[in-house]
Amino acid sequence: MKAQADSRFDYVKINLASPERIRQWGERSLPNGVVVGEVTKPETINYRTLKPEMDGLFCERIFGPSKDWECWCGKYKRVRHRGIVCERCGVEVTESRVRRHRMGFIKLAAPVTHVWYLKGIPSYLSILLDMALRDVEQIVYFNSYVVLDPGNASNLSYKQLLTEDQWIEIEEQIYAEDSELYGIEVGIGAEAIQRLLQEINLEEVAEKLREEILESKGQKRAKLIKRLRVIDNFVATNSRPDWMVLSVIPVIPPDLRPMVQLDGGRFATSDLNDLYRRVINRNNRLSRLQEILAPEIIVRNEKRMLQEAVDALIDNGRRGRTVVGANNRALKSLSDIIEGKQGRFRQNLLGKRVDYSGRSVIVVGPKLKIYQCGLPREMAIELFQPFVIHRLIRLGLVNNIKAAKKLIMREDPSVWTVLEEVITGHPVLLNRAPTLHRLGIQAFEPILVEGRAIQLHPLVCPAFNADFDGDQMAVHVPLSLEAQSEARLLMLACHNILSPATGKPIVAPSQDMVLGCYYLTAENPKAQKGANRYFGSIPDAIKAYEQGTVDLHAYVWLRYNGDVVTHKPDTEVLKTETLDDGSVIKHYRERRVREKDGEVISQFIRTTPGRIIYNKTIEDALVAL
């Protein structure tokens, strides 16, 4: 197994495991030739000696020693006895960490169905058997018999369900003196399901289904295609349908379901141990009942209980009553450990913490460029620490790493100067979960800011589906030159204007920006302080607003010699004034124009300081491009 773990591989494939494969996982030969792996006892540890019980759920012979280089009985201690198998207890002297990957197995006295394939959506067992899920459940949980071979009976058919009373009636007919019935076989429970699955010839059924699909349509055709798809997948993966019925159950390594002693001498244990214990107890009881040739009804009841125990172990609560522990809390099964946000995949494998990353709340940074983000100093010094230390040593400010770290801890002014130099031109990646499309991660040039929040340009929010009501974002530092150049060329926010899904612009003003634009250009008849004043230039008007002599929404006259476009044509002269120098002032609705001999000398337009600021901001932005 170690050799397999060390070797490189391209992908991981999840497949159905055969009973032989499950045995191989848990079964192994000790150096002295003894084969171990089967867990036969429900005990965990001896509460007097606090040592694992042999052949139990924490058995050292099966899973390896609890202490490094020490056998169960204590005869062999120290690393010099590496690989020796103790003659007294049969434990191999090795490291205790093998208990994290060595598995065991439970050999079941009767086969049981896998609850995922029975109660999953869709139910693969019912699809393969071409039976209703309700009927398959009736068979599995010992409520109905199924005809495995109708023999010469004219009133029976293959896979027909029979109640207890119906089967008793048929039995009486079979064993009657004048009976001509023979070859009739019925079954119940997972054994019957296993037999039905074993009789399926996948290639023949697939060929037959393809012919039927060509001739059928509608709902029937969809059902046939669904069944064919499942069968084709079984053929492609070289899996047998009867592997969905378990005869051997794997026992996961003990260090993945630990038992911990608490201060008061009590023990805290993983729920899995309780679920495994239920399976082993019922399995052992069933074995004893079979040995003593107990009545069929008792054996059948025990088989049903074993099926329910295995169901609870694999997926507690999927079918029937949920198994609960102390305080009526549902026990966590294998499925509960794997699935969901807190499961093994999303929490521990996909959601691993990585170096050179940080996380903080985002706030709006209105003065940032679209390709910039505000990075808190506290976070930046931690993320870029190796780069800062390297530069401090290269500049001769310190002689070694330890001195550089002390300088950083003291927050010496030279550190901030060096940090500024380091982050210049070094992009960082910002990610907001959930990352549903590629624009969920983008690159930005960091700008050092005070505080503890990451500042984000409001225009990139739609791409991240972010808002500023408490959202958090993660920061990652690309380390290699290739990663940095890729981030700069492909992932910089200013290169991601269009949505990759639709091709439409994803960068669009929203929320505060739209509100701000509306507020600047809106009318407010009540705020008319300084109205009807004349200004010779845009800077004069803005200065007057900043000094508080004019309200933002007050109508003023601004000298402007460019073209004026209004939503309604402004060509109607309301009034004309003739001045002493012969020039004429024409009063329009939105402007006043002074002309002489047909030439325009000056033009004043009616506007507000808010609209002047809005127009100037857009003009400056366009000039900057």
From Swiss-Prot:
It is an enzyme of class 2 (transferase). SUPFAM superfamilies: beta and beta-prime subunits of DNA dependent RNA-polymerase. Keywords: DNA-directed RNA polymerase, Magnesium, Metal-binding, Nucleotidyltransferase, Transcription, Transferase, Zinc. Mg(2+) binds at residues 467, 469, 471. GO terms for molecular function: DNA binding; DNA-directed RNA polymerase activity; magnesium ion binding; zinc ion binding. Zn(2+) binds at residues 71, 73, 86, 89. It catalyses: RNA(n) + a ribonucleoside 5'-triphosphate = RNA(n+1) + diphosphate. SMART domains: RPOLA_N (SM00663). Gene3D superfamilies: 1.10.40.90, 2.40.40.20, RNA polymerase II, clamp domain, RNA polymerase Rpb1, domain 3. One of its GO terms (cellular component) is DNA-directed RNA polymerase complex. One of its GO terms (biological process) is DNA-templated transcription. Binds 1 Mg(2+) ion per subunit. Binds 1 Zn(2+) ion per subunit. Transmembrane segments: none annotated. Its EC number is 2.7.7.6. Its cofactor is Mg(2+); Zn(2+). DNA-dependent RNA polymerase catalyzes the transcription of DNA into RNA using the four ribonucleoside triphosphates as substrates. Belongs to the RNA polymerase beta' chain family. RpoC1 subfamily. NCBIfam families: PRK02625.1, rpoC1_cyan. In cyanobacteria the RNAP catalytic core is composed of 2 alpha, 1 beta, 1 beta', 1 gamma and 1 omega subunit. When a sigma factor is associated with the core the holoenzyme is formed, which can initiate transcription. This is DNA-directed RNA polymerase subunit gamma. It comes from Rippkaea orientalis (strain PCC 8801 / RF-1).
